[in-house]
């Protein structure tokens, strides 16, 4: 799965594409309580993320 760096309006556009009518939020849902949570900017702009990562921010 290709990953890419998404920042600013590119990140918002990608979220609209992936989440559609479900909408999205900027803090991830914790998968495990001990896992440190990265915000979407840290995950997808400072680093790279995939469409699957983005889907974790959909409502």
UniProtKB/Swiss-Prot annotation:
It is found in: Secreted. Disulfide bonds join 7-45, 19-58, 44-49. SUPFAM superfamilies: Insulin-like (SSF56994). SMART domains: IlGF (SM00078). It holds the Pfam family Insulin. GO terms for biological process: glucose metabolic process. Keywords: Carbohydrate metabolism, Disulfide bond, Glucose metabolism, Hormone, Secreted. GO terms for molecular function: hormone activity. GO terms for cellular component: extracellular space. Insulin decreases blood glucose concentration. It increases cell permeability to monosaccharides, amino acids and fatty acids. It accelerates glycolysis, the pentose phosphate cycle, and glycogen synthesis in liver. Belongs to the insulin family. Due to a substitution of the Arg in position 31 by an Ile, this insulin B chain is longer than most other B chains and is processed differently. Heterodimer of a B chain and an A chain linked by two disulfide bonds. This is Insulin. It comes from Chimaera monstrosa. The lineage of its organism: Eukaryota, Metazoa, Chordata, Craniata, Vertebrata. The gene is ins.
């Amino acid at each position: 799965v290709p990953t890419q760096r998404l920042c600013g309006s590119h990140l918002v556009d990608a979220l609209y594409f992936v989440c559609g009518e479900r909408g999205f939020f900027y803090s991830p849902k914790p998968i495990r309580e001990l896992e440190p949570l990265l915000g979407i900017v840290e995950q997808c702009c400072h680093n790279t993320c995939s469409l699957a990562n983005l889907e974790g921010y959909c409502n």
